[in-house]
C-alpha cells in the first residue's frame, strides 16, 4: 500500500489550522459556524507558450462550467452574466456541427447533466431544466426556498436532484419542486457529484468532502488536501478531487467514502473530467491538461496536451474519445479528438 507522506503532513497541518480557528471562534463549537480557510482558486494562467492541441472553437466571456451530453451529442458550456443579477448563457456545441446560444431565464451558478438529453442549472430559489435538443429552458421553483441562493446541483441515477446552497445546506429533492431531506453542516456547498443514488458534497472553505446516502442524510466526511477546489465523478464510480492548493489529484471511493489515491500534480490543478480510460486534470499555471490511468492503484500519466489559456473547465465524450477544454478567459473551446489515443 502506498502512503503519501507529504500529502499526509499537509493534510494534518490544514486540519490543525482549522482546529485552531474553531477553538478561537467559540467556546461551544457544536453551535458555531464551521471553521473555514480561504477557498483555493486556480492560478492566473500566463499566455500559452505553445500552440494548443487540436481544434479551437470560438467562445467569449468567462465560462464557468461544461458538460458533455451523449444523448443529444452536444457540449454545453455555462457562462455567467456580466453581473450577479444578469441572465446566464448556455452555449451548445453539437458534435454534428453548429453552435447555439441559449439565454437562460436568469442567473445560474452551477451546471449538471444526467446523460438524458437535459442539463440542470442552479439559481436563486430553484433551478433551470434545459432540453439540449430543443434548446429550451424551463425554470423550476422549489417550495419554500424562494430566497435560497443555490450554488451547486447534481442529478442522481433515480432522476432526483441534489442541490447545495451558499449557507451550507444540502437539499435532496423528493419531487421536482419539493425537498425530501436537507442537512446544514457545511460552510458552503461548492460542488456536488453523484454515484448511483449517493451524493458527495465539496466544501472549499472546509476543504472537505462529505457523502450523502440515498435518503439525503450525511454519512462519512473527510478532509480533502490543503485546498480542494473542484470535483468530478467518473464512469468507474470514483470521485476525483483537485487539491489546487496542495498540488494533488485525490481519488475517493463513495460507499463508504474513502480516499483511495493521492498523487502530486503541480502547477495548480483545477479542471477535472472523468472518462472510461483516463482521469483528466488541467494545470492552470502551465496551460496543460494531463490524462492519468487510475487502474494500477496509483495514477500513471499517459498523455498530456498544451491548452488554451486558463483551462478551468473540462468535459469528455467517451463515445468519440474527445476531450473538451474550455478557457475561462474567452480564449475559446479546445477540441482534442482521439485524446486518450493508443495506450
Predicted regions and their residues:
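Predominantly soluble domains enriched in secretory-pathway, periplasmic, or organellar proteins
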Residues: 2-10, 19-343
